[in-house]
A protein has these predicted regions:
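Residue-level signal for short hydrophobic patches within transmembrane helices
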Residues: 11, 15-34, 38, 60-67, ...
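Residue-level hotspots within the lipid-embedded alpha helices of multi-pass solute transporters
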Residues: 29-33, 66, 106, 110, ...
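Interfacial/gating helices of multi-pass transporter permease domains
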Residues: 43-62, 94, 129-134, 194-195, ...
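Short alpha-helical transmembrane segments in multi-pass integral membrane proteins
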Residues: 1-22, 79-145, 189-244, 300-365, ...
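Small-residue-rich hydrophobic transmembrane alpha-helices
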Residues: 51-111, 149-168, 261, 274-338, ...
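Helix-terminus/linker motif at the lipid-water interface of multi-pass membrane proteins
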Residues: 30, 34-52, 121-129, 185-192, ...
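Transmembrane helical elements of multi-pass membrane transporters/channels
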Residues: 20-39, 141, 152, 175, ...
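Short runs within selected transmembrane alpha-helices of multi-pass transporters and secretion channels
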Residues: 72, 141-160, 168-179, 197-212, ...
Length: 444
């Protein structure tokens, strides 16, 4: 396959198409995970105060990711559908609308962060003045220049929808490698500490944007795009209508996770450490599922736009088979080999039993979490983002009362069971919903 040739999602073997599209996406996720671990390692050398300041500021990055999901997910579905229908004019209109709306969101969000940075950090009731100042500096730099991150997300969504996931892998990997190099240089050599970490992130994001722009010049997909043209309210509204539910879902998930983290911290530092390490181990499961979900999304949107409904059904079944087998494998590994796995990350014998409990309990839900993620991709590809958002918001919110009640009887394990049970329910409900929906609406 030539470098800038897209993967044909409308014809040929389905498994091959899905895999070729998913592999670069999954590789990007795993590189991102490795970067996050190394990044936290460098910041950790500055002390717990620096880690706390970056952690607090990071919450607003998560909220920003939820915001950019609105134009990203909406445009990914509609660009994919218009490509499948071979409607070049609509494809162009949706791409322009996606970039224009995301840039507007980024400017508004960045201005709010810069103006209210002090007030926003005060929400976390930090006591140490150094930590507060570091948090404010990290916040206004990373979120004040969030426009590059937003533009990169839109490029990623559109290129994936068009079958160009290899391009996104190259661009993102370039940024991650650069970030790995810049972190120690700016943090320690230039002695910029937390500010250095923030600058490394922004510089890397700018480079990623430049790589995307370089690629865009060579792709027919972007040849007639005019970002300075008058915004088309009709196309923007269609994008935002589809992207709004998952955007709210993402931001609420962040808020719920923050509350759950507070519950976990009430059981002491060991529980916090177990959750941090355990979630990194568990991410191997959902990252692979996320990669195939993005692949299923693009495959579904293009074939839905081309009215290849039978191929949509077959694509979903193929994707679910792959993701289901992966989820089953990770469930078995976490349930039957928790000790050897967790001991690779934490060696203290007093912590290991808690880590084993975490992996076993979460192991029961891996299969269901994977099929939920994959099914969300299929729904999003159809432009029907409301069902997965409803299921996620309702049952993720249920984690809070479940965690409070179960932890009263089971200790911190009750929180793990609340997370696992809710994932099992979400996977079961969403898959059932999609099967019923596709039988009624997707008739070949």
């Amino acid at each position: 396959m030539k470098k800038n040739q897209s993967i044909d999602l409308l014809h040929g073997p389905i498994f091959k198409s899905l895999s070729l599209l998913a592999i670069p996406i999954m590789a990007t996720y795993f590189i991102q995970m490795a970067y996050n671990l190394v990044d936290m390692l460098w910041i950790g050398f500055l002390g717990s105060g620096a880690v706390a300041s970056v952690g607090v500021s990071g919450n607003f990055m998560y909220l920003a990711n939820g915001l950019v999901n609105m134009p990203k997910i909406g445009s990914q579905a509609l660009v994919g559908q218009s490509l499948g229908a071979n409607n070049k004019k609509e494809t162009k209109n949706y791409i322009e609308a996606a970039f224009q709306s995301s840039i507007l969101f980024a400017l508004i969000y960045g201005i709010i962060i810069i103006v209210f940075q002090k007030n926003l950090i005060q929400l976390f009731n930090l006591k140490d003045s150094t930590i507060i100042q570091d948090a404010q500096n990290y916040l206004w730099i990373t979120c004040g220049f969030i426009i590059f991150s937003f533009v990169n997300q839109i490029f990623t969504g559109i290129l994936t929808a068009a079958g160009h996931s290899k391009n996104t892998f190259i661009a993102t990997t370039t940024g991650l490698v650069l970030n790995l190099i810049l972190d120690p240089v700016l943090i320690f050599v230039c002695n910029l500490r937390v500010i250095g970490a923030a600058l490394a992130t922004i510089i890397a994001q700018i480079i990623v944007t430049l790589v995307f722009l370089y690629d865009a010049k060579k792709l027919d997909l972007f040849q007639e795009i005019k970002l300075l043209s008058k915004p088309d309210k009709n196309h923007i509204s269609k994008i935002l209508k589809i992207g709004f539910p998952p955007s709210i879902q993402s931001m609420l998930f962040t808020c719920i996770s923050m509350y759950i983290a507070r519950l976990i911290s009430s059981f002491g530092a060991i529980s916090v450490a177990v959750q941090k390490v355990g979630s990194q181990i568990e991410s191997i499961s959902w990252m692979a599922a996320d990669g195939f979900s993005a692949s299923i999304n693009a495959f579904t949107s293009q074939n839905y736009g081309a009215k290849n409904y039978n191929r949509v059904h077959k694509g979903y079944k193929t994707g679910m088979l792959v993701v289901g087998l992966w989820g089953l494998l990770t469930s078995c590994i976490l349930i039957f080999l928790p000790g050897p796995i967790f001991s690779c990350f934490i060696h203290e014998s007093d912590i290991l039993p808690y880590g084993i409990d975490y992996l076993i309990i979460l192991g029961f839900s891996q299969l269901f979490m994977c099929i939920e993620i994959a099914t969300q991709g299929a729904f999003n590809g159809l432009g029907k983002t409301l069902p997965p958002s409803i299921v996620s918001i309702v049952f993720t919110s249920a984690r809070i009362p479940m965690a409070i009640v179960l932890s009263h009887f089971l200790g911190v394990n009750g929180i793990w069971w609340a997370i696992s049970i809710s994932s099992i329910i979400k996977g079961t409900v969403l898959v059932t919903w999609f099967i019923l929906y596709s039988k009624r609406r997707l008739i070949a």
